[in-house]
Amino acid sequence: MRYRLLGQTGLYVSELCLGTMTFGGATGIWESIGNLQQDAVNEQVKFAVDAGINFIDTANVYSMGKSEMLLGQALISLGLAREQLIVATKATGSMDESPNGRGQSRHHLYNQVDASLKRLQLDYIDLYQIHGFDPLTPFEESLAALNDLVRSGRVRYIGLCNLAAWQIMKALAVSERLNLAKFVSVQAYYTIASRDLEREVVRVIQDQKLGLMVWSPLAGGLLSGKFNSADDKGPAGARRGAFDFPLVDKMRAFKCVDAMRPMAERRKISVAQIALAWILSKSFVTTVIIGAKSMDQLRDNIASSRVQLDEAEIKLLDEVSQLPPEYPGWMLAYQGQARAKPPYKE
């Protein structure tokens, strides 16, 4: 297992992060995503940590708090050293039907960090993330609250998820102007079949030296190699069959799978491992979040950390999955040619 620095911090996190969305199986969409209970959760956490993973990501809304509870109990039952683990969770989503049961107000963030700490049975959260954009709460309020949580010791670092490039830059500017704790990481959807992140957000991540945590790297299982057509529901119990998320161009995805399959067959490994290895080959990626419904899935995903694609394979996959030109990107590239090389005169 390799480790990478999280943004501009001095904190090393494993290049694979254990996702916990499959823990709990509450009603609704959560049951279709995963229904792992305590014994299975303990087994997954132990296997991941033994494999070198030191980074675990959860959220208050996952199975409406049950994911955090199961994870917290696993850490205690397994007797894991707290200082050796980086635990991340999130807040923003709706936790109840009260007027202030969602969002990023000081009121909600304070209540939710305390609730998460209680469920996790922890004294502090390593990385506390806003789980999206709240159009009603000014960044000034949210960041001041998060800054206070950092100063109190309940939170050590702060991150964000699923924001547009302009929103990320605005948040960083507010922190700079008011001398508040800054977001150190971005959690975002990125796969070989869905590279939209590269248009704007990746540029911000690189320019501002933020960490990138990739969620749903297999597009909800679509890139596992177990689906054969856009209408295919996959094997029994497949998440895509019941919960068709996240959004992906399925024809584009199958084109990528067709390119990855020979690489997997030559190595006698799964297509999923090739898809994960491609993401890990990108220098702007800090960690890839892997969530599994079974131990077989977890073992297979973790094995991707040992897969090294060669330059020719990466080039082929980059070309197959290349984004179509879009303005202003193509204009910037065209105009940039004039500054690509230093001037020279015989």
Task: Pin down the residues of each PLM region.
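Terminal-tail/helix-coil boundary detector
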Residues: 1, 207, 231, 235-262, ...
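N-terminal binding-site loop/beta-alpha segment at the start of enzyme catalytic domains
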Residues: 1-85, 151
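Conserved, mostly hydrophobic/aromatic
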Residues: 6, 18, 56, 71, ...
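Short, well-ordered coil/turn segments that N-cap beta-strands
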Residues: 11-16, 52-54, 80-85, 122-126, ...
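Active-site-proximal loop/turn and secondary-structure-junction residues that shape catalytic pockets
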Residues: 22, 60-62, 91-93, 129-134, ...
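Glycine/proline-rich, positively charged
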Residues: 27, 96-196, 200
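Generic structural signal for well-ordered alpha-helices
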Residues: 45, 68, 72-75, 113-117, ...
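Aromatic-lined glycan-binding groove of carbohydrate-active enzymes
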Residues: 197-235, 270
